[in-house]
Amino acid sequence: MNTFLTFDLLLVLLVLTNLLLLVSSRLVTCIRTVAAQGVALALLPLVLGHDQVATIAGALLALTEVLLKGAVFPWLLFRALRVAQVKREIEPYVSYTVSLLIGILTLFAGYGIAARLPLPDPAISPHLVPVAIFTMMTGLLLLITRRKAFTQVIGYLALENGIYTFGVAVARDGSPWLVELGILLDVFVAVFVMGIAIFHISREFDHIDADQLTALKD
């Protein structure tokens, strides 16, 4: 199969996973979706198979992406999910239908924004930056429109996935991969801490709704 066709198919998969995150109320589905998204993103530079993977940093980043987002993060979230005994995001601030419509609008807006950015030439794919922007916006939507702390952690992961995708678009030598690796390690620490926090919160309270947790007092 043509390399760039495979690359674009991975981008289509990324778009579909974003849409699924916006419409799914089942937390198990969201965790599995963001894990699949992370594994697919790790394949993007490997599919290109030329200068971007020529550096040790690029290969290391892809391997780290698969291990953390495909195994470690889901394990942490599933463990906390079992303890909290929650299954669904019942009452989001914004309905799933409206979230989907906003997501579709941001996908189209991404093409307009990408056309105005000073990106490296030639572009790897005309769809790469718009999809990266869409993925970042999906993460932000999950962060601000969902009540459950679990879903907000998933939104944080989706946001980082968008940053990673944008890094693939601008990477032309080894240095951008080092920046991305640093971001990924920061995300690992953040998700680890969030997982522990959710674990302890669920033991002390009968909910993990972020809007109620903001009202806690000494």
Give residue spans per PLM region:
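Alpha-helical transmembrane segments of multi-pass membrane proteins predominantly involved
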Residues: M1-D218
